[in-house]
């Protein structure tokens, strides 16, 4: 039996959706093929890589991609992670379930380097917690 497809989307496929893809592969990988993309492709943020490494998830081989309409149309579940992606996400066929899990963009955090780093860790943990809830409840 083929796996279901989950597609995580955000603006630049740099931080939030990359972290979601990493968590998704770790937590949902038995039942789901996990992908991520952005409205634009900004490249992997080094702090996203570092934050995920702290929880033993390696995302260095993931790529920053724009939305692939083939994956979008084959997906079972599409999750937008920011308002921009929610507003600009292309139409999907009726069978594709869509949901919005909003998280702040850690790349836009203000303050000292330490404060900015803390935001990356917090967003990483919130995304991981949300995916764990999804794994248990399907919602």
Curated annotation (Swiss-Prot):
Subcellular location: Cytoplasm
A GO cellular component annotation in the UniProt record: cytoplasm
Enzyme Commission code(s) on record: 1.20.4.4
Entry keywords, A to Z: Arsenical resistance, Cytoplasm, Disulfide bond, Oxidoreductase, Redox-active center
GO process annotations (BP): response to arsenic-containing substance
Pfam families: LMWPc
Catalytic center residues: 10 (nucleophile), 82 (nucleophile), 89 (nucleophile)
InterPro entries in alphabetical order: Arsenate_reductase_ArsC (IPR014064), Ptyr_pPase (IPR023485), Ptyr_pPase_sf (IPR036196)
Stored SUPFAM superfamilies: Phosphotyrosine protein phosphatases I
Coiled-coil features, chain-numbered ranges: none
Annotated S-S bridges: 10-82, 82-89
PANTHER family cross-referenced by the UniProt entry: ARSENATE REDUCTASE
Function: Catalyzes the reduction of arsenate [As(V)] to arsenite [As(III)].
Family per record: Belongs to the low molecular weight phosphotyrosine protein phosphatase family. Thioredoxin-coupled ArsC subfamily.
NCBIfam families according to UniProt: arsC_pI258_fam, PRK13530.1
Protein name: Arsenate reductase
Species name: Oceanobacillus iheyensis (strain DSM 14371 / CIP 107618 / JCM 11309 / KCTC 3954 / HTE831)
Taxonomy of the source species: Bacteria, Bacillati, Bacillota, Bacilli, Bacillales
Gene assigned in the entry: arsC
């Amino acid at each position: 039996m083929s796996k279901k497809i989950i597609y995580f989307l955000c603006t630049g496929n740099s931080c939030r959706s990359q972290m979601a893809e990493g968590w998704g592969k770790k937590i949902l990988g038995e039942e789901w093929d996990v992908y991520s993309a952005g409205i634009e492709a900004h490249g992997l943020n080094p702090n996203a890589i570092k934050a995920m490494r702290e929880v033993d998830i390696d995302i260095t081989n993931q790529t920053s991609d724009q939305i692939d309409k083939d994956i979008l149309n084959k997906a079972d579940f599409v999750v937008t992670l920011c308002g921009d992606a929610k507003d600009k996400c292309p139409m999907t066929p009726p069978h594709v379930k869509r949901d919005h899990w909003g998280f702040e963009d850690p790349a836009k955090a203000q303050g000292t380097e330490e404060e900015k780093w803390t935001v990356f860790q917090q967003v990483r943990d919130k995304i991981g917690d949300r995916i764990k809830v999804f794994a248990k409840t399907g919602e």
